[in-house]
Amino acid sequence: MSEMTPREIVSELNRHIIGQDKAKRAVAIALRNRWRRMQLEESLRVEVTPKNILMIGPTGVGKTEIARRLAKLANAPFIKVEATKFTEVGYVGKEVESIIRDLTDVAVKLTHQQAMEKVKFRAEELAEERVLDALLPPPRDAWGQAEQKEENSSTRQVFRKKLREGQLNDKEIEINVAVPQMGVEIMAPPGMEEMTNQLQGLFQNLAGDTKKKRKMKIKDALKALVEEEAAKLVNQEELKEQAIYNVENNGIVFIDEIDKICKRGEVSGPDVSREGVQRDLLPLIEGSTVSTKHGMVRTDHILFIASGAFQVAKPSDLIPELQGRLPIRVELEALSSNDFKRILTEPKASLTEQYVALMKTEQVDVQFTEDGIKQIADAAWQVNETTENIGARRLHTVLERLMDEISFDATEKAGQAFVIDAAYVKARLGELVEDEDLSRFIL
């Protein structure tokens, strides 16, 4: 789990996301509170529940991007889901409990990677010995049995030195390696994913572990053997227990598009994918026990962050019980022309930086001037105002249109330089931006 302070979390998010300080602060505090809770005594820790967050804001302002970046910072089990993918229990479609099952799978994978990293050094030593055994097979006695190998023999040490220096990387050897188990694909109706997973696991266990002699280069053999030896050093049962503990205490679920499951007042009749899904989410957010293939998982201390544009529906259209379980409300602001300008230049691996790097692979030098960047930002903002406001995603559309000619002819224009200034942008986009009908279809 991340031990970063709220200020450090906000600072890290600022490297990738422009503006939206309120949302960043709320997320940073929620993430830090996970760490604070773990420092409490057991009796008090059980009572401290996470304060779930509802992020409200138009499309393309950074809600999903905050979730993506948070996943990398959290160093904890994290899953992002779309609320529209789920249906009420009893109907065809995914049930909301599959969120926790998927989160547990993520936790098992994360815990497995961490455990493998801890034993990596020892696994590398064991893999090295197996490669040396293949290079220098121990002599056999009269009964055909391999004699005790001499660990410190001069020949073995010479080969060990060469192996570590990479001099033997391309030499081929024959070794016994575990054969990857064949995947058994089972077709099942929607909603039966858990049973399908259990059956697949059963068939794979029946196959058992088999080894096969393979000829491979030493560098590939070392990689395969390190993984094999590391897997032997890891206790799978302990790993599952640790993963479930991680989910229950540090898990974070990000539910996007929650406004799409609001029941609008004028709609009547059965509403499979809306109010029913909200009611199914209630026990998960409030705290319940979900059965997964790794064991039972309690959701009492999992942090839920929901987000939605709420352009048609309002947060008050959510059922009251769900509103009460999302106590922290954060509004994200629409982006201005100045925000667009900052988005184009300030974040790490900004859009302009990406295009410059892509063209450099073709030996084409592209430079964006300050007035050119301002013109791009103004064009994107103007199109958003006159047509549908899709936020920062409009920059992708505008830039693709702007760079279309250079990208297409880049192979023939190697060694040339292009300056993207205000005049260049106006020449390529001016007419499209001015004509509202053209903007609707092209930008």
UniProtKB/Swiss-Prot annotation:
Coiled coil, from the record: none
Signal peptide (UniProt feature, chain positions): none
One CC-aspect GO term: HslUV protease complex
Binding site for ATP: 18, 60-65, 256, 321, 393
Molecular function terms, GO-annotated: ATP binding; ATP hydrolysis activity; peptidase activity; proteasome-activating activity
Keyword vocabulary terms for this entry: ATP-binding, Chaperone, Cytoplasm, Nucleotide-binding
Keyword Translocase: no
Subcellular location: Cytoplasm
One GO term of the biological process aspect: protein unfolding
InterPro entries in the record: AAA+_ATPase, ATP-dep_Clp_protease_ClpX, ATPase_AAA_core, Clp_ATPase_C, HslU, P-loop_NTPase
Record's keyword annotation contains Nucleotide-binding: yes
Binding partners and assembly: A double ring-shaped homohexamer of HslV is capped on each side by a ring-shaped HslU homohexamer. The assembly of the HslU/HslV complex is dependent on binding of ATP.
Protein family per UniProt: Belongs to the ClpX chaperone family. HslU subfamily.
Protein's job: ATPase subunit of a proteasome-like degradation complex; this subunit has chaperone activity. The binding of ATP and its subsequent hydrolysis by HslU are essential for unfolding of protein substrates subsequently hydrolyzed by HslV. HslU recognizes the N-terminal part of its protein substrates and unfolds these before they are guided to HslV for hydrolysis.
Protein name (database record): ATP-dependent protease ATPase subunit HslU
Organism: Vibrio cholerae serotype O1 (strain ATCC 39541 / Classical Ogawa 395 / O395)
